[in-house]
Regions:
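Generic secondary-structure boundary/loop-capping signal
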Residues: 1, 51-55, 61, 86, ...
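Arg/Lys-rich, positively charged N-terminal/basic patches that mediate binding to nucleic acids
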Residues: 1-36
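Residue-level recognition of specific faces of alpha-helices
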Residues: 13, 36, 40-43, 66
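A general secondary-structure boundary signal
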Residues: 30-34, 38, 62, 78-87
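Basic/aromatic recognition patch in beta-strand/loop cores that engages polyanionic ligands
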Residues: 47-83
Length: 115
């Protein structure tokens, strides 16, 4: 069975998420959400292909897969010995821009906000 390995970015993001939730909603809520995320990630050991391939969903060249849990996208890669957690992004974050440099802002939004 493969082990889960977190990149430093993913581990930092998980800690920051716990801190932000604790400040906003309290420690108990933060623990519950982080447990939900980490339990779902641990479940990848039983079924590593649970998440769809990013390349099939978004037409980008990538070996990443992702799962969606507790309003967060968790990106991971299947390796020989590990399932590597690359990073996680809240559903409101533009992960396509942050991961792949792909701008997903629709033209009408750009026009409206004059960006």
């Amino acid at each position: 069975m493969k082990k889960i390995k977190y990149t430093p970015d993913a581990a930092d993001k998980l800690r920051a998420l716990k801190s932000a939730i604790s400040q906003e909603y309290g420690e108990d809520k933060a623990k519950k959400i982080i447990k939900s995320i980490t339990d779902t990630i641990k479940g990848l050991c039983d079924y590593e292909e649970k998440g769809p391939k990013v390349s099939k969903m978004f037409d980008v060249v990538s070996d990443y897969r992702y799962i969606f849990v507790s309003r967060n996208y968790v990106f991971y890669r299947i390796e020989d010995k590990y399932i590597r957690i690359i990073n996680l992004y809240h559903e409101k974050e533009d992960f396509m821009w942050q991961l792949f440099g792909i701008d997903t802002t629709p033209q009408d939004t750009i026009d409206y906000w004059d960006e």
